[in-house]
């Protein structure tokens, strides 16, 4: 078995008709493949869009709504209908499914993050198939994860999956838009995600979904940095899921970081919300970036913002003003400033176990998406 624990993400276009309504036939194609993989011993998680698509018709809308309240109402109806389809299909093969609705707050709060990961682990151990979506009905727009590509990568990293498969209506990442550029070539293997890759992914996706190729590259970055390989491939092939599970998919494969980030480091890098800014001198910058040491109070050159003990802050170079990383502090801002003024600034401010350096890939996530 090439990959045992796999997260599959299906977009709205992969489970709907051209008019945006839910396609039971497409869902059956996906669940049939999931059932075969499950019976072969794989541990599976499905991140599925489509709640709005499943619900807008039932509420009398002629087409997919645009207003936030209309979309949230459609999602409230559609999520139940969507789960009904998945549950009916999987239960006919003797498989228990579970619904989990997540929001950005479930990742930003460390305890909720750990609880979600624990629940998913139990479900997988008990051979259930978790079906995950963002909690669209109650999510505030500015506090949303925003797309299920990103959500699937966050889930894959959280549960230390062996593979993330992003299923779409496009069979991978191309050097240009294959619909308008006959010279566009698919990239079958991507070892590093950089500005050039992001530029290639700049086009928009299907009219019915929100996850274009750019969000898939963002997802691939999160997963690959966490040590999870990623496939982007078409859901239209009848055996797409099985082929991906055996590393034979017809799509684009993203090579993971050789030593993926541990769960604590993932949380710091991708989900923790920075409560302040700390500037450090050249000696501290070298100790953090080159030697993997803790940040000492004596290396702090300046503090901005108000934060408490064990809050996350972003650390910057005083010389270049560039971000060096993020960490959880052992002193609140008021106490730290008092110590600095008294010239008695001794001890550890951020322990190296609570520190993550900003790699080029993480910097791309912070600046490009």
UniProtKB/Swiss-Prot annotation:
SMART domains: PUA (SM00359). ATP binds at residues 9, 168-169, 210-216. The lineage of its organism: Bacteria, Pseudomonadati, Pseudomonadota, Betaproteobacteria, Neisseriales. Its main location: cytoplasm. This is Glutamate 5-kinase. Its EC number is 2.7.2.11. It comes from Neisseria meningitidis serogroup C / serotype 2a (strain ATCC 700532 / DSM 15464 / FAM18). Substrate binds at residues 49, 136, 148. GO terms for biological process: L-proline biosynthetic process. GO terms for cellular component: cytosol. Residues 275-355 form the PUA domain. GO terms for molecular function: ATP binding; glutamate 5-kinase activity; RNA binding. The keyword ATP-binding applies. It catalyses: L-glutamate + ATP = L-glutamyl 5-phosphate + ADP. It is found in: Cytoplasm. Catalyzes the transfer of a phosphate group to glutamate to form L-glutamate 5-phosphate. Keywords: Amino-acid biosynthesis, ATP-binding, Cytoplasm, Kinase, Nucleotide-binding, Proline biosynthesis, Transferase. NCBIfam families: proB (TIGR01027). Pathway: Amino-acid biosynthesis; L-proline biosynthesis; L-glutamate 5-semialdehyde from L-glutamate: step 1/2. Belongs to the glutamate 5-kinase family.
């Amino acid at each position: 078995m090439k990959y045992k624990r796999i997260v599959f993400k299906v977009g709205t276009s992969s489970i709907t008709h051209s008019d945006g309504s839910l396609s039971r036939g497409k869902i059956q194609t996906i669940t049939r493949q999931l059932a075969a993989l499950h019976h072969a011993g794989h541990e599976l998680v499905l991140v599925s869009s489509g709640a709005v698509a499943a619900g807008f018709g039932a509420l009398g809308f002629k087409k997919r709504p645009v207003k936030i309240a209309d979309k949230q109402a459609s999602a409230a109806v559609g999520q139940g209908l969507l789960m009904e389809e998945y549950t009916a299909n999987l239960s006919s093969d003797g498989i228990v499914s579970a619904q989990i609705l997540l929001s950005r707050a479930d990742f930003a709060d460390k305890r909720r993050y750990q609880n979600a990961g624990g629940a998913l682990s139990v479900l997988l151990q008990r051979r259930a198939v978790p079906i995950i979506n963002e909690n669209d009905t109650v999510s505030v727009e500015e506090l949303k994860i925003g797309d299920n590509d990103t959500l699937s990568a966050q889930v894959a990293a959280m549960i230390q999956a062996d593979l993330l498969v992003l299923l779409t209506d496009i069979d991978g990442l191309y050097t240009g838009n294959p619909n308008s550029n006959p010279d566009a070539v698919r990239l079958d293997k991507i070892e590093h995600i950089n500005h050039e890759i992001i530029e290639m992914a700049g086009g928009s996706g299907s009219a019915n979904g929100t996850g274009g190729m750019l969000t898939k590259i963002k997802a691939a970055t999160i997963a690959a940095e966490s040590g999870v390989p990623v496939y982007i491939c078409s859901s239209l092939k009848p055996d797409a899921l099985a082929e991906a599970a055996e590393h034979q998919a017809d799509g684009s494969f993203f090579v993971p970081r050789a030593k993926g980030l541990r769960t604590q480091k993932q949380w710091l890098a991708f989900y923790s919300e920075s409560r302040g800014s700390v500037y450090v001198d050249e000696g501290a910058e070298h100790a953090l970036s080159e030697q993997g040491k803790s940040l000492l109070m004596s290396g702090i050159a300046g503090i901005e913002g108000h934060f408490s003990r064990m809050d996350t802050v972003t650390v910057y170079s005083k010389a270049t003003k560039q971000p060096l990383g993020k960490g959880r502090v052992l002193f609140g801002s008021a106490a730290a400033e008092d110590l600095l003024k008294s010239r008695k600034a001794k001890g550890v401010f951020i322990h190296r176990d609570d520190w993550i350096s900003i790699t080029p890939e993480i910097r791309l996530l912070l600046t490009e998406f």
